[in-house]
Structures are given as structure tokens and as C-alpha cells.
């Protein structure tokens, strides 16, 4: 009976378990299904010893009067029926201490007993070979134990009521499958990792819900392809990123039932020649349906071309707009991945040149947009970009339409030709400058692709001293927005990308804006403007990086981790410009007010020091006597000023005084270690990647590191173990090295100096990282969070006061209305009472006899006398 009951419980547990389906990997699915047959949670071992052995032992009636020492105890009757044999100690007829029991059906137990129950450490073996070794609590496997199946499968971990519950590790005996993580009621539930092969190259780490992948997780396949994101019902579902290392592809976006569906970004990485550099990679950003590009989307080609429009099943279909690598644009209908009206686009180039102005005017009128928004060249060459008459070739097409419109029509052709020659003479140097600045802060790229952003371009402008021509970077942004039709919200965006041809166009436009008055009476004017800019600004100063952001590679990688939050703070405290186009800008005055609101202006960071930091790289801020706080700051200047503040101030005191403020949301840990910065700000550890907090790190939109091209993982992870070492550990590791040849170097004065300087550099970097963390996380970000909370509270109070005022007004109006009703009722009541009073009053006698003449006065007196005399007589 016992054996049958145990087997029934065990079979019921097997039937309740459903093997995990791994639809994304057939070979792993076979292994997991096979393993799931072994991953049965043994049913709770409930030996039949429990109830009978708890009963009080009987006494023979014949020995009722015997002494207590002579009392005889008998083993419970039911125990004799269940236990075939027992070897061990007994106390009062109950099993006690260590013993060995053989049950009906062949099950055995060897271990500790207490009051007749299996209690403590023991080993229970079923007749079919299943074995449990571990803790027992009153006949039930509890706490920690090890299950071993006949085929060699094992489980070691926490056990509750005989089932796997808590943290434990399972290994399959027939397949190289293992799981380590959390369990609930015998099923994988919570955080856990499963490995599908012996080499550990195929695995899943993340969330489980009763044997089903659900939540956040990372799946690495045997091929090396890896997915990181959300799961639902064992399939990729939600936001996630898939990297196909076998085909050099990557998709980041929305998934449905294991397939790309929704908005996402698909990137194709190209194999590049070593030490080469390219500006772009093939990339699609838009809508997906069942894994196909379908709907609205943009495709960026590695050559520099770009298509934006409608897609149907991976093909261009419907209305779209394609920009070729030379800058030419076609906008119209597409069919079956080709232009629908190809012949209409093949217009003669010379004919289009003669009618450039007419075509441009008609196209602008047809679209009904402004000149700045539709300034793209409308004169098309052959659609493959051939037959270029530009001296720069078909790969680069300068956009000079608006600049040439500033000159007489008869001199435009000469101006264009001369400036193209000037660019051609400097194209090698300009390419080198573009590559240099676009690679700033970029540690690694899979395909040597570096793309300049506005942040890099601002650094180039400041290094070349463009702002010394009495024009700020914010003014330059506005000038470029007029020539290039940049949307208002992106005029000062640091993440806007800049291609090489756009970079050249920007230089020509700024050269004209800065020097056109000087050469307006000379020809070719545009050529002279550009030549002077190259000679005075670019050639002498380019690639000599200044400032606090890009001056050192390692520090740049650390600093980039705070750029997203700083951009959020920057935009929050910008105000609309007073002049068109009324975009949001940051003035020095607003910056200082912001720091004052954050309680960061103190003895360490005074207003004078603030002004001097800003004036380091700008000659128009401070002239020794007066300061210009109306100067506009772009985000680069804002962020570099913050980096400088983190270096020039004593942040221990600042943080200590700041934390004394009654802020509930300020972090309690004042000093961030290097390891804290590495773990929290730079990359996720495997365990952190599978936590719920990891969802904060993942976003369907690109982070600032992706936008700017910074990939800090490789170098920072290499430097992480170095930063964690102390000086003593370094010395110990050096002593462990082989003494052959190297011992002399370490013992030499030169070697000691080298190692000492190396340690000093590590300590210096460590201190800088700590200061950076304290300043940004513990001070700046906490102050911003508190300030935003105050603003929300003030707004909430204002809304509540408005609601209360409105309610009070409504109540007053209702009260006034009731009072008016009462007044009206009172007036009507008084009128009604007056009417009743008039009706009830009797008529007066004089009013009834108005015509009766009054009697003579004498008669009246006599009558009164005569009436009074009888009265007197009666009284007497």
C-alpha cells in the first residue's frame, strides 16, 4: 500500500509537469524535453508512521497498579503493518535516534528518528530507485536535500513539503542539460539559468513562470547568436535586441511571438578592411510586420544614400523619397522596389542646369513649403548618381543653391567652380579632420563605422576658434538651420548626425556668413571666404582637442555615462529665445540660477569661479572688468562646465553639506566607488541583466552612447580588474612573476619609477571617477530630482487651490441663490400678510358718515355733564 501510494503521488507530480518548449532552437528543445522527463518533483514523503506513532502507548489493565519504572510500552499496531523491519533505538515504544526502517513495498529509510517520526538528516529510497538525501521534518522532506533519479539526474537545493521550492540546481542524466535558479512547487519559477549543452554555449538566463520563459531574459544560441529582451510563453515577445553574429546583423525593437513585429531598427554590419573608417552602415528604422519591412520606414545605405517612405514585404512600394549618395533627391512613387516612373527622372543635366531656378520654383510651389524646408537640389542626374559634372566626383555633391542665390546670376557658375576647386585642394585634409573628430570618444566599432555628431562638430568649431569671430555656437546653429532646413527642436541637438558632404556644406555656409562682408566687392567671393577660413582657423588649430570632454579617451568614456541625464536637465532649464525661430536656449544667467536652485553655489563653487570656468574657452564672457551673462551656451559648453566643476571643487564638503539638507531622495551613500560606477553606469553584469531593474537599462530608442558612437564596454571591462586592485595586490602580483629577466627590471630604479608612476595614474583615475560619481549622482542628479519633486508639489498644490477656489465659488453662488430665494419668499410673505391685514380691519365711523355735520361745541359739553351727574349720584 505504501509503495503504491508513493508511486501514485510521484506519477501525479509527473503528469502535472509540462516540459518546457523551446521553439527558438530545435536542438535545444529536444534536450529540454528529454530533461523535463527527469525534472519531476518527488511527492512529499508522508510515511504512515505519522498518526499511529503519535498516540499515547497503552498499558495492560493487569498492571494498572505497577510502578512507573516497570511500565511496558508496545509499538503502535499500524506501525507493525507498515514497517516490515526496524533496526535502531526505541524510547517508550517509539523510534528514536538513528535507525534503519524497511517499509512495505520495498521503500527504505536510514537516518534520524524523533518520537517515532523521521526527523533530521536521513536517506529515503523508493523501490523504483529514486533517492532523497537531506533534511526531514516530521516525516516530510524539508529545507535542503538532494534527489537522485535512477537515470543519473540529480537535484540539490531547497525543498518544501517534498517538492523543489526555493533555490536549487538540477542536472539531467541523459542529456547535457542543467538548470540553476529558483523553483516553486517543483517547477522553474523566478530567476534562473538553463544550459542546453556541455560546453555552455547554448543557454538562457532570466525570468521563469512555472517552467515557461516569461519576463526579461537573455538567450544565447549554440551558433553564438544572442537575444536580450522580453519573453512570453517561451517566445521572444515585447521589447528586445537580437544579434546574429553569424550574419553580422542586429535588430532592436518590438517582437511578437518570436518574430519582429512593430517598430524597430535592423542593422547590417559590413566587414571592413583593418584600420579603415566608414561613415555609415546599412540600417533600417521603421515598421515591421511578421519579420518583413512593412509600412513607413527609413533605410540608410552604407554609401550615404537614404530612402524614406512606404514598404511592402521588404520592398519599396508606394510614395517615397530617395536621396542618392551625391545628395540628389527623387520624390515620387515606387513599385516593386523600383522607381515607378524611371524615364521621367532621366532628364538631361545641361537642360536642368539652364532651368534650375524654374524647376526649383515650381517644385516649391507644388509642395507649398518654405525655402528653408525644401532647399534640396531638385535637378536630378541619372538615378545611379553617374554623369557628375562636379569636380569633387559623384560621391560628394555640394549644396550651394542658397549661397549662390546671394550672387548675381552671371557670376554664379564661376563662384561654384572656384569654390569646388578650393574644396578639392583641401579634401584630403578635410576628410582627415572629419575622421578624427567623428572618432572622438569611440572605443570600438564592429565595422569601423564612425559618424560625426553635433557634439563632435561643436568641439571642432571651438578648437578652430570659429567663435572668436564674434559669433557664438548657438548663433552658428541658427545660421545652419536656415540654410539646411533643420527642425526647430533639433537646432541645438547634440545627437544630430553629420555626413561628410554635410560637414563640407556647413563649412562653406559658415565661411560665407563670417567673411562675406569683407569680400563682397571681390570675385570670386565665396572662394575667398572659404580660403581665409581654412588658412586662419582650420589649418592651424584643427585636431588640437581642448576642453574637458574629449581631451582624454578613458575619461571621455566615463563622462559619456552621464550625458543623457545632463541633456534632460539642460532642456528642462532652457527658455524660448526672444528672436526667431524662438527655439529653446540656455543662457549663462539661467545656468547660474539653476545651480543656485540646486544649492550648489557655495564657498567651493562661487559665482566668480562659475564665470571663470565658462570664460576659459570663450573670450567674450569676461574681459577682466565686466561679465556677459546673456551669452548663450550650447550643450557641449554646459556639459564641459559641469565636468570642470567636478574637478575644481572639494566635493566631499559639498556632498556632506548637501546631504545635511532635508532631502528625502538624496542617496545615503555619499561616496561612490570605482566599482559602483562601473557596475551601475557602464555595463550590466549577467545577474543584473536578468533582474527586473534591467528593464530600465533597455530602451527601444537608442541611448546617447549609441547616438554618439561610444562603445565603452570593451575597454572599461578590461580596465575594471585593474581598478579593483590595491597597491599591495599589485606588489604581490609582481612578486609572483618569474624572476628570469623581469626580476631585474622590477628591482631597478627605472622599473620602480615606472611602477610608481603607473600606480599614481591608477589612483588619480580612481579619485577622478569617485569625484565624478559624487558630483553627478549624489549632488547634481539628486538636486534635480528634488527640484522636480518640488515643482510637481507646487503644481499639485496650485491645482488643488484652484479646485478649492472653484468649489468655494460654486458654494458661494449656491448660497447666494438660496438667499435670493429666501428674500423673494420673505417679500411675498410680507405682501400676503399685508393684504390679509387690510381685509380684516373694521370700517371707521367717520368714514361711514362723512356728510353728517358736527354738533355744536356747547351741546357736546352739556351732554357730557348730564351723563356724568347720574354716576355721581349712584356712587353716593
Curated annotation (Swiss-Prot):
It comes from the Eukaryota. GO terms for cellular component: 9+2 motile cilium; axoneme; cilium; sperm flagellum. SUPFAM superfamilies: Histone H3 K4-specific methyltransferase SET7/9 N-terminal domain (SSF82185). Residues 1-72, 360-386, 841-876 are annotated as: Disordered. Residues 1-16, 57-66, 373-386 have a biased composition (Basic and acidic residues). The keyword Transport does not apply. Gene3D superfamilies: Histone H3 K4-specific methyltransferase SET7/9 N-terminal domain. Keywords: Cell projection, Cilium, Coiled coil, Cytoplasm, Cytoskeleton, Flagellum, Repeat. Residues 752-841 form a coiled coil. It holds the Pfam family MORN. It is found in: Cytoplasm, Cytoskeleton, Cilium axoneme; Cell projection, Cilium; Cell projection, Cilium, Flagellum. MORN repeats lie at residues 86-108, 109-131, 132-154, 155-177, 179-201, 204-226, 227-249, 251-273, 284-306, 307-329. InterPro entries: MORN. Transmembrane segments: none annotated. May function as part of the axonemal radial spoke complex 3 (RS3). Radial spoke complexes are important for ciliary motility. Interacts with RSPH6A. Does not appear to be part of the axonemal radial spoke complexes 1 or 2. This is Radial spoke head 10 homolog B.
Amino acid at each position: 500500500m505504501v509503495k503504491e501510494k508513493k508511486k501514485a503521488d510521484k506519477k501525479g507530480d509527473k503528469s502535472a509537469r509540462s516540459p518546457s518548449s523551446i521553439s527558438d532552437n530545435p536542438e535545444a528543445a529536444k534536450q529540454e524535453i528529454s530533461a523535463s522527463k527527469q525534472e519531476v518533483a518527488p511527492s512529499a514523503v508522508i510515511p504512515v508512521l505519522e498518526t499511529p506513532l503519535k498516540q499515547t502507548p497503552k498499558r495492560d489493565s493487569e498492571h494498572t497498579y505497577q510502578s512507573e519504572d516497570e511500565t511496558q510500552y508496545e509499538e503502535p499496531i499500524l506501525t507493525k503493518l507498515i514497517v516490515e523491519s526496524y533496526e535502531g533505538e526505541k524510547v517508550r515504544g517509539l523510534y528514536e535516534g538513528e535507525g534503519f526502517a524497511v517499509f512495505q513495498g520495498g521503500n527504505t529509510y536510514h537516518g534520524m528518528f524523533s518520537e517515532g517520526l523521521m526527523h533530521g538528516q536521513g536517506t529515503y529510497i523508493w523501490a523504483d530507485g529514486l533517492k532523497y538525501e537531506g533534511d526531514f521534518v516530521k516525516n516530510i522532506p524539508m529545507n535542503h536535500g538532494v534527489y537522485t533519479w535512477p537515470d543519473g539526474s540529480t537535484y540539490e537545493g531547497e525543498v518544501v513539503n517534498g517538492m523543489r521550492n526555493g533555490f536549487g540546481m538540477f542536472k539531467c542524466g541523459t542529456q547535457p542539460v542543467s538548470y540553476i535558479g529558483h523553483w516553486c512547487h517543483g517547477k522553474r519559477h523566478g530567476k534562473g539559468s538553463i544550459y542546453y549543452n556541455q560546453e555552455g554555449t547554448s543557454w538562457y538566463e532570466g525570468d521563469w513562470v512555472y517552467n515557461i520563459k516569461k519576463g526579461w531574459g537573455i538567450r544565447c544560441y549554440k551558433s553564438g547568436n544572442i537575444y536580450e529582451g522580453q519573453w512570453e510563453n517561451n517566445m521572444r515577445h515585447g521589447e528586445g535586441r537580437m544579434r546574429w553574429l553569424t550574419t553580422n546583423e542586429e535588430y532592436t525593437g518590438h517582437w511578437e511571438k518570436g518574430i519582429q513585429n512593430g517598430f524597430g531598427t535592423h542593422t547590417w554590419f559590413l566587414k571592413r578592411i583593418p584600420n579603415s573608417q566608414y561613415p555609415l552602415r546599412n540600417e533600417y528604422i521603421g515598421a515591421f510586420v511578421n519579420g518583413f519591412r512593412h509600412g513607413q520606414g527609413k533605410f540608410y545605405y552604407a554609401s550615404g544614400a537614404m530612402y524614406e517612405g512606404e514598404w511592402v514585404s521588404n520592398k519599396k512600394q508606394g510614395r517615397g523619397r530617395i536621396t542618392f549618395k551625391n545628395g540628389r533627391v527623387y520624390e515620387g512613387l515606387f513599385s516593386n522596389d523600383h522607381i515607378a516612373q524611371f524615364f521621367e527622372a532621366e532628364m538631361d543635366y545641361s537642360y536642368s542646369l539652364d532651368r534650375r531656378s524654374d524647376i526649383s520654383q515650381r517644385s516649391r510651389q507644388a509642395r507649398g513649403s518654405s525655402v528653408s524646408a525644401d532647399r534640396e537640389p531638385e535637378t536630378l542626374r541619372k538615378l545611379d548618381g553617374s554623369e557628375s559634372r562636379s569636380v569633387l566626383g559623384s560621391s560628394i555633391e555640394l549644396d550651394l543653391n542658397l549661397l549662390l542665390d546671394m550672387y548675381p546670376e552671371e557670376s554664379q557658375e564661376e563662384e561654384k567652380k572656384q569654390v569646388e576647386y578650393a574644396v578639392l585642394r583641401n579634401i584630403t585634409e578635410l576628410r582627415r579632420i572629419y575622421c578624427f573628430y567623428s572618432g572622438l570618444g569611440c572605443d570600438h566599432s564592429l565595422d569601423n563605422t564612425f559618424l560625426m555628431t553635433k557634439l563632435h562638430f561643436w568641439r571642432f568649431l571651438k578648437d578652430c576658434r570659429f567663435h572668436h569671430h564674434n559669433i557664438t555656437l548657438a548663433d552658428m546653429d541658427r545660421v545652419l538651420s536656415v540654410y539646411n532646413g533643420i527642425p526647430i527642436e533639433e537646432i541645438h541637438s547634440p545627437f544630430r548626425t553629420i555626413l561628410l558632404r554635410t560637414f563640407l556644406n556647413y563649412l562653406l555656409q559658415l565661411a560665407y556668413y563670417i567673411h562675406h562682408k569683407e569680400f563682397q566687392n571681390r570675385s570670386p567671393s565665396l572662394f575667398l571666404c572659404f580660403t581665409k577660413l581654412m588658412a586662419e582657423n582650420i589649418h592651424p588649430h584643427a585636431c588640437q582637442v581642448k576642453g574637458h570632454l574629449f581631451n582624454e579617451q578613458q575619461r571621455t568614456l566615463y563622462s559619456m555615462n552621464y550625458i543623457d541625464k545632463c541633456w534632460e536637465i539642460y532642456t528642462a532649464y532652457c527658455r524660448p529665445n526672444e528672436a526667431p525661430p524662438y527655439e529653446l536656449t540656455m543662457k549663462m544667467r539661467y545656468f547660474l540660477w539653476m545651480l543656485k536652485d540646486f544649492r550648489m553655489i557655495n564657498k567651493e563653487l562661487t559665482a566668480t569661479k562659475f564665470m571663470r570656468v565658462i570664460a576659459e574657452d570663450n573670450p567674450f564672457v569676461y574681459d577682466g572688468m565686466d561679465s556677459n551673462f546673456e551669452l548663450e551656451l550650447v550643450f557641449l559648453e554646459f556639459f564641459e562646465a559641469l565636468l570642470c566643476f567636478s574637478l575644481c571643487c572639494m566635493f566631499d564638503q559639498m556632498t556632506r553639506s548637501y546631504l545635511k539638507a532635508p532631502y528625502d531622495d538624496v542617496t545615503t551613500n555619499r561616496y561612490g566607488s570605482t566599482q559602483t560606477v562601473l557596475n551601475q553606469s557602464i555595463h550590466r553584469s549577467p545577474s543584473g541583466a536578468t533582474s527586473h531593474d534591467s528593464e530600465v537599462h533597455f530602451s527601444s530608442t537608442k541611448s546617447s552612447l549609441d547616438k554618439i558612437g561610444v562603445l565603452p564596454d570593451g575597454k572599461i571591462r578590461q580596465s575594471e580588474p585593474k581598478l579593483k586592485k590595491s597597491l599591495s595586490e599589485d606588489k604581490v602580483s609582481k612578486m609572483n612573476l618569474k624572476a628570469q629577466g623581469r626580476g631585474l627590471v622590477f628591482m631597478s630604479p627605472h622599473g620602480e619609477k615606472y611602477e610608481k608612476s603607473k600606480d599614481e595614474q591608477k589612483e588619480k583615475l580612481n579619485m577622478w571617477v569617485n569625484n565624478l560619481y559624487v558630483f553627478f549622482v549624489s549632488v547634481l542628479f539628486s538636486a534635480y530630482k528634488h527640484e522636480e519633486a518640488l515643482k510637481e508639489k507646487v503644481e499639485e498644490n496650485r491645482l488643488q487651490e484652484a479646485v478649492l477656489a472653484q468649489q468655494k465659488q460654486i458654494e458661494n453662488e449656491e448660497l447666494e441663490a438660496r438667499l435670493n430665494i429666501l428674500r423673494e419668499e420673505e417679500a411675498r410673505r410680507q405682501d400676503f400678510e399685508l393684504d390679509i391685514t387690510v381685509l380684516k380691519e373694521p370700517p371707521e365711523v367717520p368714514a361711514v358718515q362723512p356728510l353728517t355735520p358736527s354738533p355744536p361745541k356747547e351741546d357736546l359739553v352739556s351732554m357730557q355733564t348730564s351723563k356724568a351727574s347720574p354716576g355721581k349720584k349712584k356712587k353716593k
